[in-house]
From Swiss-Prot:
This is Acyl-[acyl-carrier-protein]--UDP-N-acetylglucosamine O-acyltransferase. It comes from the Bacteria. Pfam families: Acetyltransf_11, Hexapep. Involved in the biosynthesis of lipid A, a phosphorylated glycolipid that anchors the lipopolysaccharide to the outer membrane of the cell. Its EC number is 2.3.1.129. GO terms for biological process: lipid A biosynthetic process. PROSITE patterns: HEXAPEP_TRANSFERASES. It comes from Blochmanniella pennsylvanica (strain BPEN). One of its GO terms (cellular component) is membrane. It catalyses: a (3R)-hydroxyacyl-[ACP] + UDP-N-acetyl-alpha-D-glucosamine = a UDP-3-O-[(3R)-3-hydroxyacyl]-N-acetyl-alpha-D-glucosamine + holo-[ACP]. It is found in: Cytoplasm.
Length: 262
């Protein structure tokens, strides 16, 4: 179904069954598969392939040579019915690739809202990306990576499969991430290590002075004491009773499976 207000260049191929909502603009030489749905006011520049079971929300901008929803690069994949879901207001720049999920994961690769993926970013199968994230040129995510809200990842950074990146994290360019990165932290290097807190980012996003001070205290517990992760977790729970924002640390440590960067 193609809405009558959609604008589609005659050189583009839209397979029967695709759903194109109102005021979508599809430029030249695009291919849209039969199981694709594209939300209102989304713009496809040119030379874009969207395939598989792919749902794209409203007001996204997708640039040339992007490939979305294609078969993943997991050798176990046997053409099972898996998908990708993309929210609203995302900018997906040139040559970005986002692959469909696997049955070993949750069958879905999921992108939130208001993200910027710069040139040549690769998001592998089963990744879950939150909202308001920025990934600079040539960032590569392995399978099953989770990136929480308001995270910034510098160019040429690679993140190992199954890693979790906490909210408001900033990762410097050319880093290699092989373990989980707790919330609010600046990390850099190969392998990535912590370099303090993303204080400037917290201020820009309106965190109160008391919350920032509490986050500093939590960082000292986790990284400036001799505590094990388990004993640090108990100390953080006590701090969270007075400052609920610290529950971000506690919940993250509970979720972590690969261990945290130290």
């Amino acid at each position: 179904m193609i809405h009558q207000s959609a604008i589609i260049h005659p050189s583009s191929i839209i397979e029967e069954g695709a759903i194109i909502h109102d005021n979508v603009h599809i430029g030249p030489f695009c291919f849209i598969g039969a199981q694709v749905e594209i939300g209102a006011r989304t713009l496809l520049k040119s030379h874009i392939v969207i395939n598989g079971i792919t749902q794209i929300g409203e007001d996204n901008q997708i640039y040339q040579f992007a490939s979305l929803g294609e078969v993943n690069q997991d050798l176990k994949y046997a053409k099972e019915s898996t998908r990708i879901e993309i929210g609203h207001y995302n900018q997906i720049r040139e040559s970005v690739t986002i692959h469909r999920g696997t049955i070993q994961g949750k069958k879905v690769t999921k992108i939130g809202n208001s993200n910027l993926f710069m040139i040549n970013v690769h998001i592998a199968h089963d990744c879950i990306i939150g909202d308001h994230c920025v990934m600079a040129n040539n960032v590569t995510l392995g399978g099953h990576v989770r990136v929480d809200n308001h995270t910034i990842i510098g160019g040429m950074t690679a993140i190992h499969q199954f890693c979790i990146i906490g909210t408001h994290v900033m990762i410097g360019g050319c880093s290699g991430v092989v373990q989980d990165i707790p919330p609010f932290i600046i990390a850099q290097g190969n392998h990535a290590t912590p370099f303090g807190l993303n204080i400037e980012g917290l201020k820009r996003r309106g965190f109160s002075r008391s919350s920032v001070h509490a986050i500093r205290d939590a960082y000292k517990i986790l990284y400036r004491s001799s505590k094990t992760v388990e004993s640090a977790k108990e100390a953080l729970k006590a701090l969270a009773a007075e400052h609920p924002i610290i529950n971000e640390f506690v919940d993250f440590l509970i979720r972590s499976q690969r261990g945290i960067i130290r």
